[in-house]
Design a protein with these regions (language model features):
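Beta-propeller-forming repeat regions
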Residues: 1-178
């Protein structure tokens, strides 16, 4: 197998990458962990077609996870900043439209760092992991993180995601694995 390295852009502190297929075309996503930072998608021949997924009104992106059964839709963590308290971290939904990308907030969850989407029995669920309940500063790990689960309804515009805590007491809960 041969890999070809391609320079697409200069993104300061690019922390998150992901991809999805829409109409059999691959879209690559790149987002920064910095505040007030854009997220871009790249597609087309040699990924030369660049689109703004969200503008500088967002940032702090930790993860972008596409839905398996909802073409052109994803969830992402926005506004995660370890040094900021209180935390403004939130989960957002992105959706490809004929005019570009539409991104809407779903819910705030302080110190939301990692999440995943599970598709079980024709329903989608989100599992969210926080690194802490609260922090007085970046090095404060005295209040543990939690894990939550909630159903993601097919009509997210008219249904809220209700989270249920399923684990607590997770100190320095930085990672996640399926």
């Amino acid at each position: 197998m041969k890999f070809l390295k391609t320079h697409l852009d200069d993104i300061v502190r690019c922390y998150c990458t992901s991809h999805m297929f829409i109409d059999e075309e691959c879209y690559a996503f790149f987002a920064s962990e910095n505040p007030n930072s854009e997220c871009y998608s790249y597609t087309g021949k040699e990924f030369k077609k660049k689109e703004v997924v969200w503008d500088k009104d967002r940032g702090g992106c930790m993860s972008i996870i596409p839905f398996k059964d909802r073409e052109g839709e994803f969830l992402a963590v926005n506004e995660f900043y370890l040094k900021v308290s209180p935390s403004a971290a939130k989960l957002v939904r992105g959706k490809k439209t004929k005019d570009g990308w539409e991104v809407k907030d779903l819910f705030n969850l302080p110190y939301l760092h990692r999440f995943d989407i599970y598709h079980i029995n024709d329903k989608d669920y989100v599992v969210c992991a926080t690194i802490a309940r609260d922090k007085s500063n970046k090095e404060d790990w005295s209040r543990p993180g939690q894990v939550y689960i909630g159903e993601i309804h097919s009509d997210l515009d008219n249904n809220n995601v209700v989270l249920t805590q399923i684990a607590d007491g997770l100190y320095k809960n930085h990672g996640y694995t399926r």
